Amino acid sequence: MEAIAKRLDACQEQLLELYEENSTDLNKHVLHWKCMRHESVLLYKAKQMGLSHIGMQVVPPLKVSEAKGHNAIEMQMHLESLLKTEYSMEPWTLQETSYEMWQTPPKRCFKKRGKTVEVKFDGCANNTMDYVVWTDVYVQDTDSWVKVHSMVDAKGIYYTCGQFKTYYVNFVKEAEKYGSTKQWEVCYGSTVICSPASVSSTTQEVSIPESTTYTPAQTSTPVSSSTQEDAVQTPPRKRARGVQQSPCNALCVAHIGPVDSGNHNLITNNHDQHQRRNNSNSSATPIVQFQGESNCLKCFRYRLNDKHRHLFDLISSTWHWASPKAPHKHAIVTVTYHSEEQRQQFLNVVKIPPTIRHKLGFMSLHLL
């Protein structure tokens, strides 16, 4: 057990150093997934030995460690393959090489520079969904990688590799899911593309393959992702504010004013805002809420417990908002303090990795 604990400590320490470094070097991200793979192997072995905890860390079930190990192997292999191409010289972030981004449509492709597309169903401003068009999509073609751009037309969002289109968002299916009239309007920057009557009357005429199937490229009225400016990092799947437009019965392209796609990044360091707040409840507990990728938060929590335990009161496990209306999909760790002075001392001493965002606040709940 002691040998596994030492190896796990060293592995997680290296992971946290990579998170703090926040490198854009692809070699560092290959190393990151090697460490993730090693961590999964150690936890799997610990569970086989009958261990439920290693220090303060809970040992997950065998299936969990096995699945994470397989994911790490998959990511390591694809990144090592990408490392052999000219795209290895481009800057790459941890988020762009994460497993979550790898599984984001279009799946099993690397993606960069996403831009919001808002689709309004049934002509109703309150019935809209947001999707993402990626400026750069890295597709594996036999033994190499090809960089292409995704585009939008009345049928969906797609990218073209060679002479074939791959649709990874099918507006026909989305309209069946979220609407009742099979009509939709695509709002992309200052452009609106409306569903044609032929599309709304029958789905057979625009049968769109899944993202793993290719169809010959056709002439349409696409909108390139490279013409837009408002970028987001991950595809939001929440209800969004609609854009007022007149209904369309045929394929059309209209120009409207700029569309506010919204800033999906979390605001950090709201210290001044909370300082001005009237905290009349003397029993309110000062807190800091950390948000980021689950494994990064786990390693950060381990370091806090190991080296900075005197600078805070309590620390939570990693948790997520369960509501479908949650503003983000980040993992969260909450830390409580005896006083605002202790919290400020914590912030002055502890180095927070740039991949972790934090907010200050108060918790009125009486803690046991």
From Swiss-Prot:
Q: What Gene3D superfamilies does UniProt report for this protein, alphabetically?
A: 3.30.70.330, E2 (early) protein, N terminal domain, subdomain 1, Papillomavirus E2 early protein domain
Processing after translation:
Phosphorylated.
| InterPro entries reported in the protein's UniProt record | E2/EBNA1_C_sf (IPR035975), Nucleotide-bd_a/b_plait_sf (IPR012677), Papillomavirus_E2_C (IPR000427), PPV_E2_N (IPR001866), Reg_prot_E2 (IPR033668), Regulatory_protein_E2_N (IPR036050), Regulatory_protein_E2_N_1 (IPR042503), Regulatory_protein_E2_N_2 (IPR042504)
Which GO MF terms are attached to this record? DNA binding; DNA-binding transcription factor activity; nucleotide binding
Q: According to the lineage, what is the superkingdom?
A: Viruses
Chain intervals with Polar residues compositional bias: 205-231
* Record's subcellular location: Host nucleus
Q: Which GO terms describe its biological process?
A: DNA replication; DNA-templated transcription; regulation of DNA replication; viral DNA genome replication
Q: What is the protein name for this chain?
A: Regulatory protein E2
UniProt keyword list: Activator, DNA replication, DNA-binding, Early protein, Host nucleus, Phosphoprotein, Repressor, Transcription, Transcription regulation
UniProt region (Transactivation domain), positions on chain: 1-200
Describe, as the record does, how this protein assembles with itself and its partners.
Answer: Binds DNA as homodimer. Interacts with protein E1; this interaction greatly increases E1 DNA-binding activity. Interacts with protein L1; this interaction enhances E2-dependent replication and transcription activation. Interacts with protein L2; this interaction inhibits E2 transcriptional activity but not DNA replication function E2. Interacts with protein E7; this interaction inhibits E7 oncogenic activity. Interacts with host TAF1; this interaction modulates E2-dependent transcriptional regulation. Interacts with host BRD4; this interaction mediates E2 transcriptional activation function.
| GO terms under cellular component | host cell nucleus
Matching entries from HAMAP family are given as: PPV_E2
Which residue intervals make up region (DNA-binding domain)? 284-368
Organism per entry = Human papillomavirus type 6a
As for what it does, the entry says:
Plays a role in the initiation of viral DNA replication. A dimer of E2 interacts with a dimer of E1 in order to improve specificity of E1 DNA binding activity. Once the complex recognizes and binds DNA at specific sites, the E2 dimer is removed from DNA. E2 also regulates viral transcription through binding to the E2RE response element (5'-ACCNNNNNNGGT-3') present in multiple copies in the regulatory regions of the viral genome. Activates or represses transcription depending on E2RE's position with regards to proximal promoter elements including the TATA-box.
As for family, the record states:
Belongs to the papillomaviridae E2 protein family.
Q: What are the boundaries of the region Disordered? A: 205-240
